[in-house]
Swiss-Prot record:
UniProt source species: Halorhodospira halophila (strain DSM 244 / SL1)
Function: Modulates RecA activity.
Keyword Cytoplasm: yes
Signal peptide (from-to): none
Protein encoded by which gene: recX
Domain of life the protein comes from: Bacteria
Any single Pfam family the record assigns to this protein: RecX_HTH2
Name of this chain's protein: Regulatory protein RecX
Record has Protein biosynthesis as a keyword: no
Length: 161
């Protein structure tokens, strides 16, 4: 085997070992392989081949990523931002978030209740603190308002609706 063939095979083996652990984006995989000393001239053709073979799939990565972040209680804004940082295209992000079938309003409400309890905030300062918490978690302003309004409605209906 030629030197170029051996180098290309080494890159492929390293990439497959990384992909065996978890899904990666093309950018993540290229960065990890470069940090391990692999020549970028060999990395990019190998990544192309892996993508053509279906072994490197950013859509699949994004689906797994969205599921894990939803389980952690993160909102769509933060999830999209993190996917962009990892090099996932906006079209893929939009598609995956839409296909995730997450009720973001219910998610925001559940995250708020898990952190602060089901009661209504005692004052404006507490309401602001809760809203800022939800925004940091990646929920939109509309989702934050809806979660706060749901707490108000629950409080007015009492514990038995």
């Amino acid at each position: 085997m030629s030197e170029a063939g051996a180098a290309s095979e080494a890159v492929r083996d390293a990439a497959l070992r990384l992909l065996a652990r978890r899904e990666h984006t093309r950018r993540e995989l290229a960065q990890k392989l470069a940090r391990r000393g692999h020549d970028p001239g060999y990395v990019h053709p190998v990544l192309e081949a892996l993508a053509e073979e279906g072994l490197l799939d950013e859509g699949r990565f994004a689906e797994v990523f969205v599921r894990s972040r939803v389980e952690r209680g993160q909102g769509p804004v933060r999830i999209a931002q993190e996917l962009r940082q990892r090099g996932v295209a906006d079209g893929v992000i939009d598609e995956v978030l839409e296909d995730a079938e997450v009720d973001w309003l219910a998610q925001a409400r559940a995250v708020r209740e898990r952190r602060f309890g089901a009661g209504v905030p005692a004052d404006r300062r507490e309401a602001l603190r809760q809203a800022q918490f939800l925004q940091r978690r990646g929920f939109t302003a509309d989702q934050v308002r809806a979660a706060a309004a749901a707490a108000d409605e629950d409080d007015e209906r009492g514990p038995y609706g």
